[in-house]
Curated annotation (Swiss-Prot):
Belongs to the diuretic hormone class 2 family. It is found in: Perikaryon; Cell projection, Dendrite; Cell projection, Axon; Secreted. One of its GO terms (molecular function) is diuretic hormone activity. Signal peptide: none annotated. Detected throughout the central nervous system in fifth instar larvae, particularly in the medial and lateral neurosecretory cells and the dorsal unpaired median neurons of the mesothoracic ganglionic mass. Also detected in nerve processes over the salivary glands, dorsal hindgut, anterior dorsal vessel and dorsal diaphragm, and at the neurohemal sites of the abdominal nerves. Not detected in the nerves directly innervating the heart, alary muscles or posterior dorsal vessel. InterPro entries: DH2-like (IPR034439). GO terms for cellular component: axon; dendrite; extracellular region; extracellular space; perikaryon. GO terms for biological process: body fluid secretion; positive regulation of urine volume; regulation of heart contraction; regulation of hindgut contraction. Its main location: other. Disulfide bonds: none annotated. This is Diuretic hormone class 2. The modification Proline amide is found at P31.
Length: 31
């Protein structure tokens, strides 16, 4: 359970950074 929790937290953090990066790219390249 602990290992899965850490893995999930890490994946969630990476996903959040990725989404934030996409949002920033879209904002910068928007009209």
């Amino acid at each position: 359970g602990l290992d899965l929790g850490l893995s999930r937290g890490f994946s969630g953090s990476q996903a959040a950074k990725h989404l934030m990066g996409l949002a920033a790219a879209n904002y910068a390249g928007g009209p």
